């Protein structure tokens, strides 16, 4: 077993702080409308140019093992915020850095880290409530356009996303693909998405994005648990005869059957992906039936008197394409009869009218959206591959931000909401080190607005002081260098993004401040090559 290195107390915390600061410095340069870009080296292919916080953070690994732990914790802030809200990763990193930096000063000066942590947690709770009060719901296409435009820093992207959202609605699905042309195109396709991903990562066809994409696949739908390969073989042989890729949706796929699929996929015998059926109990049966109707297939079920041996070709579903990642499956362009789909929609609407349960209504509404909503596909094109990847990143972030805005509403952007929400901390009944914890949060809340101004070439401290005097929602437009009503100017952020950034930053900051020891593996010294033996003459 490799030997370990241990650092304690002040040394441990200062190393963590250095790691957080290094990562943050690279990430925060991208914040705001005048934020810079960061170029990331790729081992293969062209370098990636991006201003997406989480993408930059994921690329950073530091040489010093202690500092690297700090960088990894800061990376976690960006990653968690991206998972929850899909955007706001740079803001989250900036907040975390400010809290850790201010907190370290106080811990070094003798403050109790546990009391500081309590103060930080109470302060964040109060500010989160204040952010919710300052929030307002999204009203109409203009708000959606503005949220997407701010996230992507591009008016055209904002307009296209707003159009896509308008077509599919709040419950619809928007996917982003690489396009063939130089510009951006919006395609609206009847499709369906459910929250079940692949049962094994070996099915992945795109390792960079960790997803499986199948073009024109067969779709096999069954409510059986498949583990015995002998039972499954007759069905597999029928599928392989077609020489096409296939999606297998089953109650579960495990054991020999899963191994058989994986091995044949890796050998290139056929291309496939297996996913678990969505839902539970009776709802699972209904959802499988929905998928069958959308794809023009039939559920293979013992209850319907259909076994794997008796399957006929017309029982397979068909679709234009299928995209599966770790958490969801999207079926695009299902070849089901529109008449049958309309009948199914009418049936669900009837059930909606008669059901009493709120939970049941919500689930029926979800199924309705999946059947009627469809999928909007945004195709992103550019002159070079590097530019296209960067643009695609921005579009994906903007789609996530827009969905977040539709969920929890919007607040004024440019960091002004955090500055305004900080005033609630003056009324918190805290004392001693807990009060210092709240003060740490208050100082950190000024940081995003300051960094946005400085990245645009203005004096950050002056801008923050001016924002404190102004009435919400007046903020600083970093493009024009003016103080404006942020809602009227269209500078808005999703409430969910702002809230998640703050909560995740505080969580990591509190963890760093209460750290007392670091344990890392001792780097192995590379042994020198042995010398050549003397030549004999």
Swiss-Prot record:
Query: Can you tell me which residues bind ATP?
Result: 30-33, 87-91, 414, 477-479, 493
Taxonomy, superkingdom: Bacteria
GO terms of biological process kind: protein refolding
Q: Where in the chain are disulfide-linked cysteines found?
A: none
Keywords, A to Z, come to: ATP-binding, Chaperone, Cytoplasm, Isomerase, Nucleotide-binding
Q: Which InterPro entries match?
A: Chaperonin_Cpn60_CS, Cpn60/GroEL, Cpn60/GroEL/TCP-1, GroEL-like_apical_dom_sf, GROEL-like_equatorial_sf, TCP-1-like_intermed_sf
- One Gene Ontology CC term in the entry: cytoplasm
EC class (word): isomerase
Give one GO term, molecular function aspect: isomerase activity
Predominant location: cytoplasm
State a single Pfam family of this protein: Cpn60_TCP1
EC assignment: 5.6.1.7
Q: What subcellular compartments does it reside in? A: Cytoplasm
State if ATP-binding is listed as a keyword. yes
Subunit info here reads:
Forms a cylinder of 14 subunits composed of two heptameric rings stacked back-to-back. Interacts with the co-chaperonin GroES.
Q: Which NCBIfam families match?
A: GroEL (TIGR02348), PRK00013.1 (NF000592), PRK12849.1 (NF009487), PRK12850.1 (NF009488), PRK12851.1 (NF009489)
| Similarity annotation | Belongs to the chaperonin (HSP60) family.
Known role: Together with its co-chaperonin GroES, plays an essential role in assisting protein folding. The GroEL-GroES system forms a nano-cage that allows encapsulation of the non-native substrate proteins and provides a physical environment optimized to promote and accelerate protein folding.
Listed name of the protein: Chaperonin GroEL
Source organism (scientific name): Coprothermobacter proteolyticus (strain ATCC 35245 / DSM 5265 / OCM 4 / BT)
């Amino acid at each position: 077993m490799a030997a370990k290195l241990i650092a304690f107390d002040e040394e441990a915390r200062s190393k963590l702080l250095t790691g957080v600061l290094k990562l943050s410095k690279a990430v925060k340069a991208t914040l705001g409308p005048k934020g810079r870009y960061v170029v990331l080296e790729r081992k293969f292919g062209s370098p990636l140019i991006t201003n997406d916080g989480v993408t930059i953070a994921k690329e950073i690994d530091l040489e010093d093992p202690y500092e690297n732990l700090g960088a990894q914790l800061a990376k976690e802030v960006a990653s968690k915020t991206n998972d929850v809200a899909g955007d706001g990763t740079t803001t989250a990193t900036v907040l975390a850095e400010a809290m850790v930096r201010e907190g370290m000063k106080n811990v070094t000066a003798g403050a109790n880290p546990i009391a500081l942590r309590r103060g930080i947690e109470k302060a964040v709770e109060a500010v989160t409530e204040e952010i919710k009060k300052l929030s307002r719901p999204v009203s109409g296409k203009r708000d959606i356009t503005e949220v997407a435009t701010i996230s992507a820093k591009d008016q055209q992207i904002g307009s296209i996303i707003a159009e896509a959202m308008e077509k599919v609605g709040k419950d619809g699905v928007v996917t982003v693909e690489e396009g063939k042309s130089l510009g951006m195109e919006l395609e609206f396709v009847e499709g369906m998405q459910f929250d079940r991903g692949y049962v094994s990562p070996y099915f992945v066809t795109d390792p960079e994005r960790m997803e499986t994409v199948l073009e024109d696949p067969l779709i096999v739908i069954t409510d059986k648990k498949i583990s015995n390969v002998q039972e499954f073989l007759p069905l597999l042989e029928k599928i392989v005869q077609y020489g096409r890729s296939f999606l297998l949706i089953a109650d579960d796929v495990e054991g020999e059957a899963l191994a058989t699929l994986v091995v044949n996929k890796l050998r290139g015998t056929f291309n496939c992906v297996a996913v678990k059926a969505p839902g539970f109990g009776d709802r699972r049966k209904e959802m499988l039936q929905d998928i069958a109707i959308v794809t023009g297939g039939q559920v293979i079920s013992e209850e319907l008197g259909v076994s794997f041996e008796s399957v006929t070709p017309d029982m397979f579903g068909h679709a234009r394409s299928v995209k599966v990642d770790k958490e969801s499956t999207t079926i695009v362009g299902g070849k089901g009869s529109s008449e049958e789909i309309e009948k199914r929609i009418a049936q669900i609407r009837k059930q909606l009218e008669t059901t009493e349960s709120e939970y049941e209504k919500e689930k029926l509404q979800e199924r309705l959206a999946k059947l009627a909503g469809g999928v909007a596909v945004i195709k992103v094109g550019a002159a070079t591959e590097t530019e296209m990847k960067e643009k695609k990143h921005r579009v994906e972030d903007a789609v996530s931000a827009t969905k977040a805005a539709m969920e929890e509403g919007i607040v004024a952007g440019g960091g002004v909401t955090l500055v305004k929400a900080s005033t609630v901390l003056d009324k918190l009944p805290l004392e001693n080190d807990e009060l210092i914890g709240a003060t740490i949060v208050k100082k950190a809340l000024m940081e995003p607005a300051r960094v946005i101004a400085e990245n645009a070439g203005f004096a950050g401290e002056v801008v923050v002081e001016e924002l404190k005097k102004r009435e919400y929602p007046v903020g600083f437009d970093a493009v024009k260098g003016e103080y404006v009503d942020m809602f009227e100017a269209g500078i808005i952020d999703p409430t969910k993004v702002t809230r998640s950034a703050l909560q995740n930053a505080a969580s990591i900051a509190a963890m760093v401040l209460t750290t007392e020891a670091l344990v890392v593996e001792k780097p192995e010294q590379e042994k020198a090559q042995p010398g050549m033996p003397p030549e004999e003459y």
